[in-house]
Every structure is written in C-alpha cells, then in structure tokens.
C-alpha cells in the first residue's frame, strides 16, 4: 500500500513500473495511460517489465492503447483484431485477456476510472457492444474503387495543353480538397498584372500520427533547501546505514542559515551560560572539598587521642 502523490492523495496498491511511483486509478487513466502498472507487491517480487505489446511486440507508446480491468495493457488495434476473429456467437466469457485469461468485459457492478474508460472504448465496436448489452451499430463498408478505363486516354494527341492558368487552377481545386483564401484585389492599373485567387493545397488532416513524447513524472525537486529531506524515488528502497539519521541531522544543522540574535535572546543566552557555569563551579568545589576532608588527619577518629577504640 502507498499514497498517491496527486492532489487527491489516495491510498492505493497500484505501482507504476516505469516511473516507480504509487498511482491511483485517476492518475492511471490521466497520466499513465501507456505505462506498465501492476500491484506494489508484484513490483517487490519482480521489478522487470516489458514495454512492448504482447500481441505484436511493438512498443506500447507507438500506438493507441487500452487497459483491461486486470491492468494489462495492449494496443487497441491488436486487441480488436484478435477479438474480431472469434465467432460472432461467442459468449461474453469467451473474450479473455491474452495475458492472464481474465475477462475483457468489466462487470456491471464495477465502477472506477479504468472500468469506465474500458467501457467507452469497447462501445465503439460491434463485437464488444453485444457483450455489453448495447445495440449494434451500422458498420461502414468502404466501396471498392472502380477500375479506370484507359481507352479514353489512348489518344494523347487530343490533350489540350493550351489551357489558361485560370482553368487549370479551377480544375485542380475541384479535384482535391483545399482551403481557399481570397486575396483582396487592388484597383486595376495598366502597369500591374491582375491578382488571381490563391489556393492552399494543404491537407486538413496530418498524414502521420506521431505520438507525443511521454512525460516523466519525477517527484524530485532540485531547488529545495539543502537542509530539507529529499524524498527521492531512486533512493526510497535503498538500504540505509544505521547512523544515517545522525549524519542527516548534522547536515541539516550545518546547512541552515544563521539568523542574528535579538537583545533579549542574547541576554537569555548569557544568563543560561552563567547559570551553567555557576552550577559547574559548585560541583567542582564540592568535589574538591570532599576530597580535602577525606585526607585531613584531624577529622580521622582513629587519630583523636580522646577516642579510644578497643575490643567490646
């Protein structure tokens, strides 16, 4: 068990193997969506982990992922393809985790951020909607492209290359999606050419979807005061020496800044030092006086002639 370092400060037994911090389910969905997360006890037994998807052996950070209720992480495309290969009459219990053979569908009475995110993801495909008890959705079937008729282009001599630039731009604009921006036309003058429409042929959607670099949630702060205790995750589980607390105490005392004493504090300090010196002087004089009395022959009863000690 551990305490999550998010503002919720919840007690959890989940542990991120990559960042080596305790995480709750809210942080698991929001900040550790592509991290290997299991129980803290399992991390104590074996801290090694595989950052690749177990279905395609490709790093998890390269594609979109989904996390099951057993906290195993897979690529959503790999999991969807694997489940779509099963027969359509497969019972919900037949859809199992490829790693631990646990159920893919979360129970109806299970609530939490992980279960909610999994239900939202499963509701996008028909094989999972049937297991969740939801109505099926219409699958869009992409039409096959028709073969081009090359007979129409056999006579290339009929191709008219003397078309005007305005016609070429109009034809290209109608054939491909484009963003149009009309440039204001200045007043016509005989010395300046006529302004034309500028066509931006940029694609509104990016061609490649590159995953953003993963954030490293490091709880260490390098700008702390030298006297404060550093709760470093790397040194959290290292064996500490027996007298480490004494060295840390001396280091914190030596690194603290010295503030000037006020007049009242100085007077109190002098009074305390004087009292301690007076008590030390009394103890010293008492010890010396007792030693002198023990060695004084006048105080020895056996040396007194008026005292006779004999057999009784």
Curated annotation (Swiss-Prot):
Modification after translation, per record: Phosphorylated.
Basic and acidic residues: compositionally biased ranges: 215-233
UniProt-listed CDD domains: mRING-H2-C3DHC3_ZFPL1
Lumenal side: 290-312
Presence of the UniProt keyword Phosphoprotein in the record: yes
Transmembrane segments: 269-289
GO BP term (any one): vesicle-mediated transport
Assigned GO CC terms: Golgi apparatus; membrane
Positions annotated as zinc finger (B box-type): 1-43
Protein's cellular compartments: Golgi apparatus, cis-Golgi network membrane
Superkingdom: Eukaryota
Renumbered zinc finger spans (RING-type): 53-101
Topology term for the membrane: Single-pass membrane protein
GO MF term set: zinc ion binding
Biased composition (Polar residues): 148-173
Cytoplasmic topological segments: 1-268
Keyword Zinc-finger: yes
Region (Disordered): 144-233
PANTHER family in the cross-refs: ZINC FINGER PROTEIN-LIKE 1
Family membership: Belongs to the ZFPL1 family.
Name the UniProt record assigns to this protein: Zinc finger protein-like 1
Lineage per the UniProt record: Eukaryota, Metazoa, Chordata, Craniata, Vertebrata
